[in-house]
């Protein structure tokens, strides 16, 4: 079973929207009922995903030419007004279909993004994860992420 990673193309938009919907649905059902899993299928989401394909780093994991997952990431250039003057990247979304988890696809997606970031001179890679999502936290720890900051929120 050989998984390949490739850059996304505009023709992948429906696949990316479906993966995005599955990701939001999983997070809504398990961690945050305020999420709208149908948003990923909207015209607004389509426009954002197309923009990401053209202006960010979007990759697809495939098994025998069938898409099984995706990752969206972006590079953040420091602004002159920033106290921290290092080039950073942000892993925005990662999803692997249920049937293909534990195959290494997620690790390969992250490894490809890390290499891209290193080639672009990025010094720090960041990701945010829901605190209750212990599976994702364990995965991110496995691929080298460590806790750096803590974000707190309060429902009103």
Where are these regions (language model features)?
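Conserved acetyl-CoA-binding loop-helix of GNAT-fold acetyltransferases
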Residues: 93-96, 102-115, 142
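Conserved N-terminal entry element of GNAT/NAT acetyltransferase domains
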Residues: 1-14
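Conserved beta-strand in the GNAT
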Residues: 60, 66-75, 95
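Conserved active-site alpha-helix within GNAT-family acetyltransferase domains
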Residues: 107, 131-149
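A short helix-loop-beta-strand connector motif used in the catalytic cores of GNAT acetyltransferases and
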Residues: 48-60, 90
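Conserved GNAT-fold acetyl-CoA-binding loop/helix
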Residues: 24-48
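Conserved GNAT acetyl-CoA-binding A-motif
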Residues: 117-128
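Conserved acetyl-CoA binding element of GNAT-fold acetyltransferases
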Residues: 84-98, 150-153
